[in-house]
Amino acid sequence: GDDRISRINVANIKRVEILNGAASALYGSDAIGGVINIITDDAKNVMQVSSDTRYGSKGRFSEAVNADFNQGKFGSYTSYQRLQADGWQLNALEAAYATDKETKRKYRNPEKDKATDKEASTAFYSNTVNQRFTYAVNDRLTLGIRGTYYNWENDRPASVYKYNMEHETYTYGAGAKYMINKSAYIDADFYSDNFTSRYDSVSKPGEASRGKDTRKKVHYYNGSLKGIFKLGQAQKFSVGMEYVKETLMSATDDLDGENMYTMALFLQDEIRLWKNFQAVVGLRYIYNEFFKNYATPNVVLSYKWGDLNFRASYASGFRTPTLSQLYATDVAKTTDMVTIPNFNLKSEKSDYFMLNAEYVHNRISFSVSGYINKIRDMINYRGIDPAIAEQLGYGKHNEAQQRDNISRAEVKGVKAVLNVYAGAGFSVGGSYHFMDTEDKTTQEPIDKSVKNVWTANARWGHRWGLYHLNVNLNGRIQEGRYSKTYYYDPAPGFSQWDLNTRHSFNL
């Protein structure tokens, strides 16, 4: 949340690892559906400077510059990223809706569509600066400090919107890693993320600008201490603790500083019971200031038979409501719908089961997975009478809804992935993902869910002396997306194909 993905410098990404299913035992409260690990690359040379520039249609531009230095015990890693794009429309008409007298549900009424200047993607720009220093005190102890500054602002048509949005973030952190021996180390880390969102008033010709108003501020603090211990050749044990504190301030909701803290203890044991059989068992104990005690276990059993790998896993998920869900109000300007907070929300909980089989042999790999995720106390929206919201002091609006634990949900799916290395620098791959979702309260699909998704990719790379060329083709085909937010009018299916080339010169 809060634009954190936008701050990642894609030029620094070494690889991306996706962990499907609940992973709260190691990754904490928010890991109820899955985890994406983004591993960045560190320079190994004394000096390494790189620039990555991309330009596309609709004014899409990105520039990423890295400057890394290593000298003796000292290391410095600096990066800057600029992203920007023009705005564009997918449709010059604004969708109109009518209400069914019997069901009271709204439905599309294309005959009433009106011309609009609204954009599917608004013009924007962002800047991100990262700096990290490391110092190796000796062969065992390494220290590090880091910081980030990020800003983002969009530019929307004044004929439609009264304001633009502006986001600003600064982060700072410090860490230490101590190698006990070659098989064990202790890692300590502290991190702070400070986010501010503002309204930037848009003035039409002849109008005076109202300036900028702070929408909300979020302060996040995370401290952790963990140890990793290899016990012989067949076992690795991890143990640690974590403390998280969050603060929310909002001028529009008259919040001077609502706080919530969470403490956690976690442990995980990875053990090879015999040559081809491995087990991973983990547990995370959580104490939250508002939601008290909870424990999330996870178990993974894997067996290797020649080129085949089999895996079965279970994981418990747990997610506490955010401070915004507990305290903040949100108003959709286009529909004049107010969303009011709920101080009595409960934490979401889930049970995730997965079976996986994988074949890996030389130039080909194929895997198929089946899973089921059962979610309890799912936080969703419950429609309420706008008059009630007005009586509670949230103003007069056309529509109103409140966050509430109204759903039990179940997500079942099958995913198949194929990758082939054809030789001579060529590789191709593809996947198919079927997902069946159900809100057990209404017997309807989960909002925003998609049932069928196909992906395909083809890559080729070749080096001529100092010059290296990479060509990548990526495609995605997706069925329509179910949506009750937009009055049960599903977003249409689509296909998207991206062709990218990368040209590298090693001087």
Located regions from the model:
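Short acidic/polar hinge/loop motifs at secondary-structure boundaries
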Residues: 1-20
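Non-catalytic regulatory/gating segments with a bias toward low-complexity or hydrophobic composition
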Residues: 16-17, 36-38, 473
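Periplasmic-side early beta-strands and strand-to-turn transitions of outer-membrane beta-barrels
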Residues: 25, 44-46, 54, 66-165
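Conserved C-terminal beta-signal and adjacent last beta-strands/turns
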Residues: 68, 79, 123, 136, ...
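Outer-membrane beta-barrel channels and translocator barrels
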Residues: 71-74, 136-140, 179-183, 230-234, ...
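Face-selective signature of the C-terminal outer-membrane beta-barrel domain
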Residues: 134-151, 167-291, 297-304, 364-371, ...
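Outer-membrane beta-barrel signature, preferentially recognizing the C-terminal barrel domain
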Residues: 161-179, 216, 309, 316-376, ...
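Gram-negative outer-membrane beta-barrel transporters
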Residues: 233, 272-278, 372-374, 395-484
